[in-house]
Amino acid sequence: MFYQNFFKKFIKFFTIISLSQLLVVSSFAAGGGGDESKKMDVKSNYYYKAVKLINKKSYEAAIDNLLKAEKTNKKDADIYNYLGFSYRKMGNLDKAAQYYDKALKISPKHKGALEYQGEMFLTQGNLKKAEANLKKLKKICFLGCKEEKMLKESIMKYNKGQKSSY
């Protein structure tokens, strides 16, 4: 009898612990990884087309689509982040800076914008600002994230006189 009660209590305890861990893990998964302004926002077709164009390095066409997407949602940090990225890749750092600032004003912990802005700072020769962005990413990504890794790698390359691949 003692063992049956003990076993039932053990199973109940184990089930509760397992479920609570599952809830914690799923909440991290739901909020982790991406840099989306709001996970539930529906992106426009222009946004998705722009992302495809960016992946093909067609930055001018991507900018056209992102500007159209912006008209439907002026509070989407992802749109501004990709505008900053596209302008940076085209060499227009002034425009890139404006869009990274907009993205970070909307979402100060936007990992993608912090990483890409850090890359821009390195291009401008501003190591201190890039390191400040890396420090912010380390706080946001306490378990590590790809954006932190990428910026850290770029800073190491910068310190060796090498160019970043991002």
Could you describe each region identified by the protein language model?
Residues 32-43, 131-166:
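Terminal, low-structured helical/coil segments at or just beyond the last alpha-helical repeat
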Residues 72, 106, 139-143:
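Structural marker of alpha-solenoid helical repeat scaffolds
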